[in-house]
Amino acid sequence: MNDSVNSPLERSHSELRKNPAKEGDPMTVVLYGIDSDSQRQQENSVQRSDSIVLMSINPEDKKTVMVSIPRDTRAKIVGKNTTEKINHAYAYGGPDMAVKSLEKLMDVPVDHYVSINMDGVKTVVDELGGVTLTSNASFTTKDTENTYQFKKGKEYKMNGEQALAYMRSRKEEGAGGDEGRQQRQQQVITVVAKEALSINSVTKLNGIFKAAQNNLKTDLSFVQLNRLKSDYDKAQDNVERLTIDGQNALGNDNLYYFYPYENSLKDIKQKLKDSLK
């Protein structure tokens, strides 16, 4: 794998594990969708995690648990000793601080990470020849050049631009706010992962990584990715998608945060822990 893609964490394994997860063990991977593209990079803009999706993959149970973490979740930022929005961790300290802060919030080990920016999402979807999705809501959204209309329950074959517009929408009428966006992010990630991991050709898989290499970072080696491909193949048909219930409210610093309901967060933590047994 290209060195520009592989970016190991500063630790050998999670402090919440005595030993690293072995081949065939249940494991966790967090996917960060970064609010950056080529234009923002040229402007040296700060990179924050626009979407955070934590996946627990259990090849023995043949099951995947997928949890969306709202980006505005009020959380402790490990290494900064502050409490603020969880997506700030990536901006402050990249994947290392982001992973440690997520572990602090969810109380489960995070074994690996993958971060991809918005150009990368478009590139991967296009390299796959598009993805087929059924819209979870009816709404209209625009970017600088195009207008996209989606109807709830209708199936669409989307290219990279369309998939990105679909998964980023939240404020548009009918889009369902943060909860609707989280569901769409999970949809796109699930389909992209399933399509990518079903590729049997190493050459084609390498081609996808090469095309997305400037927009993709992961601590996974190519050997580990092949292992993940094998494990996920056993668990991809049984995916439990979860969202954290809570409320958006004004904090003491006059910023709006997402405050998870204690019982909802507790239940999801337990489901993740159970899935790793």
Where are these regions (language model features)?
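Non-catalytic, solvent-exposed segments at the cell envelope interface
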Residues: 1-277
